[in-house]
Amino acid sequence: MKTYSSYVNFLCSLMAIDIPDICYCFKEQYYDVNGFDVEPFEMESHCKSHVIPDENRVYVNLNEMYGENDIYFILAHEIRHCAQYQATEGIGLTDIALPETIYKWKREFSRYNPCCNDESCQEVELDAMAFTWFIGKVLLNVDVDLNCDEALVEPYKQYIRRNYSLMEIKERLDYSGLEFGRNQA
């Protein structure tokens, strides 16, 4: 059973956030990021994941994934939502986004629905998509298809590219013990 704990540690270290509780479902097994059994949870069958930001909790349905990269992208996206919420609560780095963006996130999280509904025009979704794109590009050397209007995501991509240096990424890789991606970074 794979837990992706080094990858989760890398993402959380990079964004300087509290590590979320991550629960996986795979072939009727339910477990956490440490491999311990957790209470079974329900998700819509087509959902790959959902996040409960105010509980700092992520649920991942590994049965719906198309491969390892899909899992890495989903975890990056959902953990970014945790970072966004923590930023609205004053936890983590203050430079995760501009203050006006964090204010918009706070408003959106007050109405946030963690289900699989398409909320792709929300600031929290655009930023999470841009972060996923960034992680795909930097760690996996893959262009992530975001299935959205590139013009909407581009400002977030620019901010994220400026916010994380190559040196910082390499340091966080070393710190987390994450093995893959060293050649790309």
Across the structure, where does each feature detected by a protein language model lie?
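Hydrophobic (often cysteine-bearing) scaffold residues that line and stabilize catalytic clefts
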Residues: Y4, Y72, S120, V124
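Non-catalytic terminal regions of proteins
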Residues: I22-E39, R57-L62, F73, R172-Y175, ...
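Active-site scaffold of zinc-dependent metalloenzymes
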Residues: G35-N69, C82-Q86
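Catalytic Zn2+-binding segment of zinc metalloproteases
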Residues: I79-I96
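Short alpha-helical catalytic segment bearing the HExxH-like zincin motif
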Residues: D70-E78
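Metalloprotease/metallohydrolase-associated module, dominated by Zn2+-dependent proteases
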Residues: L93-E179
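Zn2+-dependent metallopeptidase catalytic core
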Residues: M1-D21
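Short, solvent-exposed loop/turn segments at secondary-structure junctions
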Residues: Q29-Y31, M65-Y66, G90, G136
